[in-house]
């Protein structure tokens, strides 16, 4: 589907309203009620990959430089919630931000690099 398709926009709105966690560390779990490695009843763990996919959507639909602020937010979120080693895990504790599950997870690193690349490409478009 095209990123501007109404169905995609509705999906993103649902992610923002129903999936995005508001426990203090923010982030996006895989799906509503995800219990894999659950740390706190009733709150799913945020995953790097799903959170970065949300950032990638915003990079794709950005129409002006200010629209990239949310992408910057999620890139900074990733850095803030990574250990000093820079190794990214699969998911995070929803309250403490502690790394959980598979560590390191190449997929998490790949999506971070991909998001940075998308950000830079879009930023370059605006700089022309």
Residue ranges and their predicted role:
Residues 53, 70-73:
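Extracytoplasmic/secreted proteins, especially bacterial periplasmic and envelope-associated proteins
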């Amino acid at each position: 589907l095209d990123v501007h398709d109404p169905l995609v926009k509705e999906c993103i709105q649902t992610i923002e309203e129903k999936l995005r966690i508001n426990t203090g560390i923010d982030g996006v779990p895989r799906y509503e009620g995800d219990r894999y490695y659950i740390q706190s009843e009733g709150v799913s763990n945020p995953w790097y990959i799903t959170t970065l996919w949300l950032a990638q959507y915003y990079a794709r639909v950005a129409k002006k430089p200010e629209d990239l602020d949310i992408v910057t937010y999620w890139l900074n979120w990733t850095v803030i919630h990574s250990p000093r080693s820079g190794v990214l895990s699969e998911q995070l504790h929803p309250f403490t931000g502690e790394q959980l599950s598979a560590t390191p997870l190449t997929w998490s690193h790949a999506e971070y690099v991909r998001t940075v690349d998308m950000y830079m490409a879009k930023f370059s478009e605006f700089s022309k």
